[in-house]
């Protein structure tokens, strides 16, 4: 069975770019080396559901690659189903696990395999008058409810507490449909998923850490991997080579990373700037550089091509071990 890459797991990374020579004021200029078909970028807005948006974007690109046509799949169907399972897990551990709106790519593939999927038009996932997701209130309400159940020192739970949690997500996201009509055909979420021809078991997760043996599967120890999904552990250079090979052969890759890193921007740029050399090369004297806010430093370091850190296996591991990424 051929396997496709699903995710490259959380950690430090460097993104090599084919940048043309440009004056500093011109910012980044890229040469397209390889372009694989994708669907339009969707806006998660004020929701911590990047994992659902990005993975379904990957699935949509796979459908294009397989000649299935263009689809817009419902992110909030996945969020709804995932948070029901996560709530049940949280209560089973008496609150000594993670219940948060974050997630992993494995959650999406698990949902497709076990619950199916629906088109976006069938479940837009916004029941409160906005056009884009705003989950501040939803997250607060769901957290308060589930903690009252999991940590409420109740002698016995009622048989309906799961319905209460489900009703919260029904209220904000809409109910997950049991059946629906799409382009003149009747489906359930499961039969619609089957019609797409995407088999979640055909996709694998890759990562690269030294605290587990290479060439074995490992559970990445982060809170959002609460389902304990496994990833194949490869040496860093092999890990990157596999990704390059996939892209060059027409596959897209879903990459899980840390948006708190200095080199992450919301402009489609991700770099690993060398802060010390960057300050020197942008002409900033020490007084000015030290006077910049963290946000200003970040903007300056990611606004134009600058020297980048070459990330090693050891650097990646140290950052992970120290909660830096």
Residue map of PLM features:
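Catalytic-core signature of thiol
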Residues: 21-325
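Bacterial Sec-dependent N-terminal signal peptides
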Residues: 1-22
């Amino acid at each position: 069975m051929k396997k496709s890459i699903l995710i490259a797991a959380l950690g430090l990374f460097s993104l090599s770019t084919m940048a043309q020579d440009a004056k500093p004021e011109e910012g980044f200029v890229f040469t397209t080396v390889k372009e694989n078909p994708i669907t339009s970028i969707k806006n998660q807005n004020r929701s911590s559901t990047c994992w659902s948006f990005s993975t379904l974007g990957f699935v949509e690109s796979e459908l294009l690659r397989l000649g299935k046509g263009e689809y817009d799949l419902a992110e909030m169907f996945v969020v709804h189903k995932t948070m029901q399972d996560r709530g049940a897990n949280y209560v089973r551990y008496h609150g000594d696990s993670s219940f948060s709106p974050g997630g992993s790519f494995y959650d999406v593939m698990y949902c497709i395999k076990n619950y199916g999927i629906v088109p976006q038009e069938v479940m837009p996932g916004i029941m409160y008058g906005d056009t884009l997701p705003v989950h501040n209130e939803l997250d607060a309400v769901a957290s308060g409810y589930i903690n009252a159940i999991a940590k409420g020192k109740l002698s016995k739970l009622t048989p309906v507490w799961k319905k209460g949690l489900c009703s919260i997500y029904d209220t904000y996201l809409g109910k997950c449909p049991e059946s629906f009509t799409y382009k003149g055909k009747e489906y359930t979420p499961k039969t619609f998923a089957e019609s797409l021809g995407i088999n979640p078991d055909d996709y694998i997760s890759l990562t690269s850490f030294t605290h587990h043996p290479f060439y074995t599967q490992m559970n990445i120890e982060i809170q959002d991997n609460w389902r304990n999904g496994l990833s194949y552990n490869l040496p860093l250079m092999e890990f990157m080579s596999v990704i390059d090979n996939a892209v060059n052969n027409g596959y897209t890759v879903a990459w899980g990373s840390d948006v708190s890193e200095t080199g992450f921007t919301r402009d489609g740029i991700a770099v690993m700037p060398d802060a010390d050399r960057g300050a020197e090369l942008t002409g900033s004297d020490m007084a000015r550089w030290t006077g910049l806010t963290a946000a200003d430093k970040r903007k300056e370091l990611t606004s134009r091509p600058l020297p980048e850190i070459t990330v090693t296996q050891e650097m990646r591991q140290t950052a992970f071990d120290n909660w830096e990424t």
